[in-house]
Swiss-Prot record:
Disulfide bond sites: none
EC number(s) stated in the UniProt entry for this protein: 1.2.1.75
Keyword RNA-binding appears in the UniProt entry: yes
Cofactor binding remark: Divalent metal cations such as Mg(2+) and Mn(2+) ions at 5 mM.
Note: This enzyme contains bound RNA, but the physiological role is not known.
Protein name: Malonyl-CoA reductase
Activity dependence on pH, as recorded: Optimum pH is 7.2, with half-maximal activities at pH 6 and 8.
Gene3D superfamilies with a match to the protein in the record: Dihydrodipicolinate Reductase, domain 2, NAD(P)-binding Rossmann-like Domain
Function per UniProt: Catalyzes the reduction of malonyl-CoA to malonate semialdehyde, a key step in the 3-hydroxypropanoate and the 3-hydroxypropanoate/4-hydroxybutyrate cycles. Can also use succinyl-CoA and succinate semialdehyde as substrates but at a lower rate than malonyl-CoA.
Lipid metabolism keyword on record: no
InterPro entries the record matches: ASADH-related, Asp_semi-ald_DH_pep-lack, NAD(P)-bd_dom_sf, Semialdehyde_DH_NAD-bd, Semialdhyde_DH_dimer_dom
Length: 359
């Protein structure tokens, strides 16, 4: 007997922004979550297709183009089941709390609640068990809805391969250098004179928040080894922006407490799977990590859309033994797909499967 799943109606806040656009694109083809309410600030009452600058592949879906932009008001969303919030830092926090108080499940790509102790910072393959924090959140805050956050795109590009390694090996450090695309700064983004013919350092503040998020994610990975303790692991990041459109490229030097073979780590990364793959969630790639063997791959232009769910796999390559206790690898993440909208949709699918969002 085939069980029919009801269609879940989604509201996308900031629907004309770069991440909002990816939510629209991906949900327009989703088997059971559909865009039903497109919220915006400056274009209320206007058709979506007339006001959006479609900064992604394809075109505005025909069934979406004539939908009106509506106010960001929970009282107008009686028939909405899920809120996706890629709102900017500062603006997002109070809006998301308002929706949770009104009983809505909120999936947030914003940093405003990422370090609230009762709010999951969810990477579904690494820490799916943390969704149980929702129960504590509801009890503590006395609301029927909830907020779940997804990490910074940069943090995910490192945390997914590092989490797979940290789970099975005595990793005691990682030193990360990032080369990040322009879309990570939103639209219209960075002035051209700042970034063309330049590499733009993002500064100590961005470095620090990247590391802080990676530490939280690693602290929640269920490990098969007992040491070293996380407090004995050294992490450092140096982050930069360059003039590519999509795709964050990261170089990681990973050190270990004992001799560790690069070939063994490579096999671990190739075989890494998580609960989304076991559950066959619609947006879960069959391989969350794709390992490339060519010495000149991954490349941003060719590989940011890699995988059977395009843009949802982290692509790893150039894996090399540096010394007996250190390896080097590079990772590539599509920052607005896996690193933002796609990660949010995957989180929602897990929450549906686990009963936190009504099927």
């Amino acid at each position: 007997m085939i069980l029919m799943r009801r269609t879940l109606k989604a509201a996308i806040l900031g629907a004309t922004g770069l991440v909002g656009i990816e939510y629209v694109r991906m949900l327009s083809n989703h088997p059971y979550i559909k865009p039903a309410y497109l919220a915006g600030k400056g274009s209320v009452g206007k058709p979506y297709g007339e006001v959006v600058r479609w900064q992604t592949v394809g075109q505005v879906p025909k069934e979406i183009a004539d939908m009106e932009i509506k106010p960001t008001d929970p009282k107008l969303m009686d028939d909405v089941d899920i809120i996706f919030s890629p709102l900017p830092q500062g603006a997002a926090g109070p809006v998301e709390e308002q929706f949770a108080k009104e009983g809505f499940p909120v999936i947030s790509n914003s940093p405003d609640h990422r370090f609230d102790p009762d709010v999951p910072l969810l990477v579904p393959e690494l820490n799916p068990h943390t969704i149980s924090l929702i129960d504590e959140q509801r009890k503590r805050r006395e609301w029927k809805g909830f907020i779940v956050t997804t990490p910074l795109c940069t943090a995910q590009g490192a945390a997914i391969p590092l989490g797979a390694i940290f789970k099975d090996y005595k990793m005691d450090g990682a030193f990360i250098t990032t080369i990040q695309s322009l879309s990570g700064a939103g639209y219209p983004g960075i002035p051209s004179l700042d970034v063309v013919d330049n590499i733009l350092p993002l500064g100590d503040g961005y470095d620090a928040k990247t590391i802080k998020e990676i530490f939280r994610i690693l602290s929640e990975v269920k490990r098969n080894v007992d040491e070293p303790k996380l407090e004995d692991v050294s992490l450092a990041a140096t982050t930069h922006r360059i003039a590519t459109i999509h795709g964050h490229y990261e170089v990681l030097y990973v050190s270990f407490k004992e001799e560790t073979a690069a070939e063994k780590v490579k096999e671990t990364l190739e075989n890494f799977r998580g609960e989304p793959q076991d559950l066959k969630l619609p947006t879960a790639p069959s391989k969350p990590i794709i390992v490339m063997n060519e010495d000149t791959r991954p490349q941003v232009y060719f590989d940011r859309w890699a995988g059977d769910i395009p843009g949802m796999s982290v692509v790893v390559g150039r894996l090399k033994q540096v010394n007996k206790r250190m390896i080097r690898l590079v990772s590539l993440i599509h920052n607005t797909v896996r690193g933002a909208a796609g990660g949010g949709i995957l989180a929602a699918e897990l929450l549906v499967e686990k009963g936190y969002i009504e099927k």
